[in-house]
Amino acid sequence: MNQLESLKQFTTIVADSGDIELIRHYTPQDTTTNPSLILKATSLSYYQNMLEDVLAYARKQSGNHNAKMRAASDKLAVNIGLEILKIIPGRISTEIDARFSFNSDMCINHAHKIVSLYQEQGINKSRVLIKLASTWEGIKAAEELEKAGINCNLTLIFSFAQARACAEANVYLISPFVGRIYDWYNQRKLLTEDSYDREDPGVKSVHKIYDYYKQHRYQTIVMGASFRKIDQILALAGCDYLTISPVLLEKLRSSYQHVERQLFPATKFFHKPIPLSESQFRWEHNQDAMAVDQLADGIRKFALDQYNIEKILAKKL
């Protein structure tokens, strides 16, 4: 049995890709997308006919050129999601515009728009996860969306405060970014040569979150994300979900080395603490320099990719 199949015994595998052929090849349960992946997908030949359909849809919408451009962007993300849903049994994660990350109302409104576009094509909201950045405003938006029956994937998790606030908001799933945590420490030469497996700071972060969730009986799913190497993935065998890029999925599929479970259900349980207030959340998150840097950087990068998607669409409208 290869490592990918072995890993599936302990963990739900999710593909981090917008490439239909690669997703079909690796048979994941779910798939995650983001503006970076959508931008990359616009250059794939598979999606060229879809682009024409998206532009035709946008031209029929009311409003000025900018409104039509935003409509095209939403429709593109949803249409890519629709194609992916044809070949996976589970859910697609579609991301809210990162520029709304500090406005709960705009996050909520955009989420309802995305869900409506899926529903217009016959897709039940139970097959869609709305991705939001894990700012305080994003978490509060997710809390309201969950109450409305719209499940959310809270992304760009770098601090324990973010993870705790998400659990306390009863969000469906969180995505701690293992590789980007590792990158921050590595770029500052804060790691030794043997900082791997459980000593990897990104891996350690997910272990801490996973154990805390299970010990306090939170139902929020932990999905490790943003991996840089196979060792990070194998060190999280047993995590609820792992979302993995096609390059690393192929490495797992090609290896037949033994996979040993590293994360286990809790054996000790504790009462849930009083939920964090906004000021407590902001203070605790602020105390983690890596998390502050990486959350801000992640939002900026996703916003830039969203802008570039709109730029491509605007030229064609």
From Swiss-Prot:
Could you tell me which pathway this protein works in? Carbohydrate degradation; pentose phosphate pathway; D-glyceraldehyde 3-phosphate and beta-D-fructose 6-phosphate from D-ribose 5-phosphate and D-xylulose 5-phosphate (non-oxidative stage): step 2/3
Record GO biological process: carbohydrate metabolic process; pentose-phosphate shunt
Q: Where is the signal peptide?
A: none
Q: Which GO terms describe its molecular function?
A: transaldolase activity
**Principal EC category:** transferase
| Domain of life of the native organism | Bacteria
Question: What is the annotated localization of this protein?
Answer: Cytoplasm
Could you state one GO cellular component term attached to this entry? cytosol
This chain's function reads: Transaldolase is important for the balance of metabolites in the pentose-phosphate pathway.
The family note in this entry says: Belongs to the transaldolase family. Type 1 subfamily.
Q: What is this protein called?
A: Transaldolase
Give the originating organism: Baumannia cicadellinicola subsp. Homalodisca coagulata
What taxonomic classification does the UniProt entry list for its organism? Bacteria, Pseudomonadati, Pseudomonadota, Gammaproteobacteria, Candidatus Palibaumannia
Q: Which gene encodes it?
A: tal
